Amino acid sequence: AKDLGMTTVTVGGKSVSMKHVALTIGTYPDSMFGVHGAGGGPHPDWVSYSSSNLVVPAHSLVTMTINQYDSGGPLNNPFFANVFGTVGGTATIDGKVVTKVDPSAVGHTFTLRGIPQNTTPLFVSVPLPENFATDTPLTIGEGQYSKPVVVTFSFMTGSKGVYNWNCEFPCGGSRIGQFGEAMSTYGYMSGTLTVK
């Protein structure tokens, strides 16, 4: 995470000073962008996030930017078209502040949740709209991509712990409900957030 210094936020009606960090990741229609190895690794055609293991400080404000390069479609569960757990209950998509997106045009989601041994509950879920662009002017690694849909949001961490995140859009293929392949293989559409 990139250190942005200290910031003041309102928590429970009180001003609180806390560390502010930034993370930037991407979602891709394939694995050709670099992190899975030359030629896209063992599954070059699988959708993927650019990073699996994210690390941020405890008791901090985290501002995430997700560059969404992939197409999409309808969610299995429209619940995940809503923004949850962010500062103000909002996300900014290509400069527009939103609380939800069209559930029939989602590319992926970033859905973060606690695991049982964590003492601090945390649930953040942000829909990443479908990228309708058809041109591919950007070269990243060995892949060709369109200009991304840029999604930005912030959330606050509590005490130390490890949290799981994943995509809730059915983008994996192969199994019933499209939750196989990339969706069921760690490091493609899932990962961890370690709060230190």
Q: Where are the model-predicted features located?
A:
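Extracellular/periplasmic metallocenter environments
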Residues: T86-G89, D94-K196
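Extracytoplasmic entry segments of secretory-pathway proteins
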Residues: A1-D102
